[in-house]
């Protein structure tokens, strides 16, 4: 045992140097103390927290920027569609037609009519025995009409008409059928069948978190055209230079001022907790009115 002790600690000396060496080792052990470990963990936690905070900020900024881009695309697409359709209001319509129906509903609503294929029309040469009877346009070319499309029949004497759905076109016989539904009345000889378009634009606020710009063509179900559009306003410029919310007659309208407001899909917590918004305004000259 003594030899083993001497091998490990060295031989004892009178001066006690061996004891001093042992004390030195005990005073400076290898590794870290508990306090040092706690400090290191604290510093690491601060660094990780700061890095995570930077990541969250950048990630949130990226999400908001993506929403802003989508918002700008939606509002531009919606405005372009309305400009294109409203500019056509009244084109090719027979006399007595109302090409614009305005509604100051806040958000506003507008309905416009125009003939989308001018020249594609045929006259009925035989009075309809029943509202469900086919339209006999003997001697007229009906090849421009397509099945499964909307058309319009107009009685110039009664100055009335309606949309109907074409189910079959007999080009050789010049007959047009509408088997899905009868008309509201029997149209006389001399009534005209034509292609006419009707577009209705309005805001659907059924889901208050996601209002949408809706478009309805003829009698089809309304469809979403642009998402997260919260406001739509129309002002009608009259021939005398005055702008009104509801025009007294479409014939005195010369221009339509459109204001469209879009917002982001979600609120921005870094923007006072509110939605980011964009508003576009366009002045459309309605060249086919008042001619």
Annotate the PLM regions:
Residues 32-89, 291:
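Aliphatic-rich helix starts adjacent to a transmembrane/signal segment
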């Amino acid at each position: 045992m003594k030899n083993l002790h001497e091998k490990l600690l060295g031989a004892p000396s009178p001066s006690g140097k061996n004891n001093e060496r042992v004390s030195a080792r005990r005073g400076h052990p290898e590794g870290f103390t508990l306090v040092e470990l706690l400090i290191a963990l604290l510093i690491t936690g601060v660094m990780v927290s700061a890095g995570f905070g930077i990541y969250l900020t950048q990630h949130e900024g990226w999400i908001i920027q993506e929403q802003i881009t989508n918002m700008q695309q939606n509002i531009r697409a919606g405005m372009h569609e309305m400009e294109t359709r409203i500019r056509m209001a009244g084109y090719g319509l027979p006399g007595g037609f109302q090409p614009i129906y305005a509604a100051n509903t806040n958000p506003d609503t507008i309905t416009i009519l125009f003939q989308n294929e001018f020249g594609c029309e045929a006259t009925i040469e035989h009075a309809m025995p029943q509202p469900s009877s086919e339209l006999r346009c003997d001697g007229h070319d009906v090849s421009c009409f397509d099945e499964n499309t909307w058309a319009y029949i107009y009685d110039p004497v009664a100055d009335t008409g309606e949309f109907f759905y074409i189910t079959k076109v007999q080009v050789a016989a010049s007959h047009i059928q509408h088997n899905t539904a009868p008309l509201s009345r029997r149209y006389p000889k001399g009534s005209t069948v034509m292609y006419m378009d009707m577009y209705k634009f309005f805001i659907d606020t059924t889901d208050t978190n996601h209002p949408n710009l809706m478009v309805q063509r003829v009698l089809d179900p309304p469809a979403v055209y642009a998402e997260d559009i919260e406001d739509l306003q129309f002002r009608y410029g009259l021939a005398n230079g005055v702008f009104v919310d509801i025009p007294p007659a479409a014939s005195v309208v010369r221009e339509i001022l459109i204001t469209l407001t879009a917002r982001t899909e979600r609120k921005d917590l870094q923007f006072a907790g509110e939605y980011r918004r964009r508003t576009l305004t366009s002045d459309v000259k309605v060249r086919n009115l008042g001619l």
